[in-house]
Amino acid sequence: MRLVFAGTPEPAVPSLRALIESANHEVAAVVTRPDAPAGRGRKLMRSPVGALADEHGIEVLTPAKASDPEFLARLRELEPECCPVVAYGALLRQTALDIPEHGWVNLHFSLLPAWRGAAPVQAAIKHGDQITGASTFRLVPELDAGPVYGVVTEEVRDTDTSGVLLERLSVSGAKLLVATLDGIADGTLRAEEQPADGVSYAPKVEVEDARVDFTAPARAVDRLVRSVTPDPGAWASFRDERLKLGPVSIVDEDLGLAPGEIRVERRRVLAGTGSAPVALGEVQAQGKKRMAATDWARGSRIEQGERLK
């Protein structure tokens, strides 16, 4: 099929690459978010999807809004049969959805109808899901509510961060997306409506959502930290400054630590929770580089009874 692909961040790159390499499809153009400042110099940078398209000489469209008349006119001129979309990052209105013959097919990183929204991988880890996956579905105006073409499942490992899990899903999801488009093209695949039961939502994770509540049980602390690693990154307040926290380890010992109370040992730094303590891995104080918690603790001269809040 003749395709126009929409996507922006790194997790969308495997899907675009797989479609470029597919013998059954032609990527006529790519739609991505406008170039944005990045890096220390804050220079305007092409999105990862846009950069891959440039490498292959594919036309790149960067509308400020997907409802821009000029963009819609160019999309009609391209005459796509289908528009696959992976983490594009902008709202697509009905005027755009109606253009391709086979609609827009979205790759979403959850087993729909679970975790509709911007942060499905983070939600799966935070809530302790043992199995998650990816779904392909036809876009409709309602958020992630369209009929589903196919799914692929993925185990959530005890050590998975959202970054690690999303990387795996982006690879397996790319294969699912190609298979879905193959099935649409040859007429062998039909979408099925999502069930009314089991709907849940995963809104965008804000910085305040990533603050660790040490009154929660250790397992909840562990899951929260992993769910927001690497973005936006877990944190707590220490001496009235923000301290970023990397993944922690649950310690199966009763040390009598109050929630957030820090205990510095020779080889580890512990913090109390609502249940068992956790051992801190890497931390990053404001204006400092990321470092082992033991190095941070030695430099901070932590006094008995000090806490992470």
Swiss-Prot record:
InterPro entries: Fmt, Formyl_trans_C, Formyl_transf_N, Formyl_transf_N_sf, Formyl_transferase-like_C_sf, Met-tRNA-FMT_C, Met-tRNA-FMT_N. Residues 298-309 have a biased composition (Basic and acidic residues). The keyword Cell division does not apply. It is an enzyme of class 2 (transferase). One of its GO terms (molecular function) is methionyl-tRNA formyltransferase activity. Disulfide bonds: none annotated. GO terms for cellular component: cytosol. Keywords: Protein biosynthesis, Transferase. SUPFAM superfamilies: FMT C-terminal domain-like, Formyltransferase. (6S)-5,6,7,8-tetrahydrofolate binds at S110, L111, L112, P113. Residues 289-309 are annotated as: Disordered. Pfam families: Formyl_trans_C (PF02911), Formyl_trans_N (PF00551). It catalyses: L-methionyl-tRNA(fMet) + (6R)-10-formyltetrahydrofolate = N-formyl-L-methionyl-tRNA(fMet) + (6S)-5,6,7,8-tetrahydrofolate + H(+). Its EC number is 2.1.2.9. Belongs to the Fmt family. Attaches a formyl group to the free amino group of methionyl-tRNA(fMet). The formyl group appears to play a dual role in the initiator identity of N-formylmethionyl-tRNA by promoting its recognition by IF2 and preventing the misappropriation of this tRNA by the elongation apparatus. This is Methionyl-tRNA formyltransferase. It comes from Saccharopolyspora erythraea (strain ATCC 11635 / DSM 40517 / JCM 4748 / NBRC 13426 / NCIMB 8594 / NRRL 2338). The gene is fmt.
